[in-house]
């Protein structure tokens, strides 16, 4: 018997295995977040800025795709933006040396919760996901999400959540969507509420 996390994942397996696929269904998971650490202490410890786009996960080129280039080109198009790019997670590739890009490496779970809470925008640039726990964790904390629309699972979350996450498919759409989020507090708040409702309705252990 096969359990899938999302419809997109199920469709991909059907496409590959066709009539030979074992019995299957979609099984949702629940989200459990640790209590947040003290923000002032965490911010000082990792030298975190006040405004940042956040990535949480394995820090390697295979997961990040073109997001370094896209982000730095965004800063060239919108030089007045104070947004920085913070990456949380173990590094598996050489760091990108730039003053607007900050690495924390591994953090404790309580620190991770606090860092997500204080992010302006949370991003998942991965091309391959079966669910994306960071997306669900960020939505549970009412954060606006920006995701890679070339990943069917992430794109499905955007549609099913009534656009609690926005997706991009190339550099231009990345820059356009990021500017929308960076420049509109109301949009971020609206998306945060949608995401919170989406997670509570679909990914609650209760």
Language model: regions and residue ranges:
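Conserved acidic donor-binding segment of nucleotide-sugar-dependent glycosyltransferases
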Residues: 160-172, 180-185
């Amino acid at each position: 018997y096969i359990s899938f996390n999302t419809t997109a994942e199920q469709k991909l397996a059907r496409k590959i295995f066709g009539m030979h696929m074992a019995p299957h269904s979609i099984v949702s998971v629940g989200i459990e977040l640790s209590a947040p650490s003290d923000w002032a202490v965490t911010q000082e410890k990792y030298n975190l800025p006040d405004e940042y786009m956040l990535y949480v996960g394995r820090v390697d080129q295979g997961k990040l795709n073109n997001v370094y280039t896209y982000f730095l080109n965004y800063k060239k198009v919108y030089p007045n933006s104070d947004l920085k790019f913070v990456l949380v997670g173990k590094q598996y590739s050489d760091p990108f040396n730039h003053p607007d890009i900050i690495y924390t490496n591994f953090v404790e779970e309580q620190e991770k919760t606090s860092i997500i809470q204080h992010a302006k925008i949370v991003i998942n640039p991965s091309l391959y996901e079966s669910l994306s726990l960071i997306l669900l964790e960020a939505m549970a904390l009412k954060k606006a999400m920006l995701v890679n629309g070339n990943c069917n699972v992430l794109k499905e979350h955007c549609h099913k959540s009534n656009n609690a996450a926005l997706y991009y498919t190339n550099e231009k759409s990345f820059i356009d969507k990021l500017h929308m989020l960076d420049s509109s507090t109301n949009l971020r708040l609206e998306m945060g509420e949608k995401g919170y409702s989406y997670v509570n309705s679909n990914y609650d252990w209760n």
